[in-house]
UniProtKB/Swiss-Prot annotation:
Subcellular localization(s) per the UniProt record: Nucleus
Chain's role: Component of the transcription regulatory complex SAGA, a multiprotein complex that activates transcription by remodeling chromatin and mediating histone acetylation and deubiquitination. The SAGA complex predominantly acetylates histone H3.
Gene expressing this chain: Ada1-2
GO terms of molecular function: transcription coactivator activity
Record protein name field: Transcriptional adapter 1-2
Lineage summary: Eukaryota, Metazoa, Ecdysozoa, Arthropoda, Hexapoda
Species of the source: Drosophila melanogaster
Alphabetically ordered keywords of this record: Nucleus, Transcription, Transcription regulation
Keyword Repressor: no
InterPro entries to which the protein is assigned, alphabetical: Hfi1/Tada1
Entry keyword annotation includes Transcription regulation: yes
Length: 308
């Protein structure tokens, strides 16, 4: 329904604009690229539309924003407790079910609470004394890059840009699943990049076939030392039976084990350093991380410019 409404309002706007549709689409790209604010986009759109066709611009913009907002997860409203004059048994059932529902529900927290204080000025500008809060909310930019917001793009963010790109090359619309797949692909790509950077800096263990890695940051063992505690098996010596409990006693040489383990520990702990641009450059030398040569070359060029 939302896709049909976007296409219907878009076709009506194309007919009303005529040759100015390309100019209108270019203005929308500037708004999506954060070059213009929403107010500037509305002002430029009013210049190429007559007053009797201005409502088509508002309908198209409203349908497009509703389409993008449809990808946002809806918050479940709290269930309304209905009162009834039933017996004590029904009241007990309601009380127990309400307690169980309260256990399942949780209060959503603001994502900005988990952002570092150094980055809060980028996301949420400081309030100005003497200016009402309503005017301050209007001064905030409605569209920002993901690098400025410090959050990964969601499906709605990607869907709006996909629609503009599809209309540019002559496509009618974009399927909703495409935006969700791209959002998941961005998360997987970022996970692979971070994993490659960390594995270049830290030791880690792999599974038998080498497909999975784990225990990242494990210290490298000294080959000249032999830890006899970890090499011994459970059944290497006869079991000692407890005569009182008649159960197997697996506590063997406890004091000696502590001594051996303390002797095999590291004398100096490993120093934790910050991930630098050099670490990113070394990790990106693996061409399997980024398959696209265009994306790889652009990011490597940006890394080199930031390092020099």
């Amino acid at each position: 329904m939302l896709t049909d409404r976007v296409l219907a309002t878009k076709e009506a706007l194309v007919v009303a604009l005529g040759d100015n549709w390309e100019r209108y689409r270019a203005n929308m790209k500037n708004w999506f690229r954060s070059r213009w604010t929403k107010e500037e986009f509305d002002a430029e759109s009013r210049k190429i539309l007559t007053p009797d066709k201005l409502h088509l611009h508002n309908q198209f913009l409203l349908a497009l924003l509703n389409k993008i907002d449809a990808f946002a997860p809806l918050e479940n409203p709290p269930a309304v407790q209905t009162s009834s004059s039933s017996g004590n048994r029904s009241k007990r059932r309601k009380r127990s079910s309400r307690t169980f529902a309260e256990r399942l529900n949780f209060e959503l927290s603001d994502v900005l609470d988990f952002v570092a204080e150094d980055n809060m000025q980028i996301i949420r500008p400081p309030t100005t004394i003497g200016i009402p809060s309503d005017q301050q909310q209007q001064q905030l930019q409605s569209q920002r890059y993901c690098a400025q917001e410090l959050f990964l793009p969601d499906a709605g963010f990607i869907m709006g840009r996909f629609l503009i790109g599809a209309w540019e090359i002559g496509l009618v619309s974009v399927d909703d699943n495409v935006a969700e797949y791209v959002a998941m692909a961005v998360q997987v790509l970022l996970k692979d990049l971070l994993s490659a950077i960390i594995k270049k800096r830290k030791h880690y263990k792999t599974s038998g076939e080498g497909n999975f890695y784990y225990d990242v940051g494990a210290p490298l063992r000294d080959p000249s030392l032999r830890n006899t505690v970890t090499r011994q098996k459970v059944d290497d010596t006869p079991l000692e039976l407890d005569k009182e409990l008649n159960t197997a006693n697996f506590m063997r040489r406890q004091n000696d084990d502590v001594t051996f383990l303390s002797a095999c520990e590291e004398v100096q702990p490993t120093e934790r350093t910050v991930i630098t641009l050099k670490d990113c450059q070394l990790a990106l030398r693996d061409r399997n991380l980024i398959g696209s040569h265009a994306v790889y070359s652009i990011n490597m060029e940006r890394l080199n410019m930031m390092m020099h």
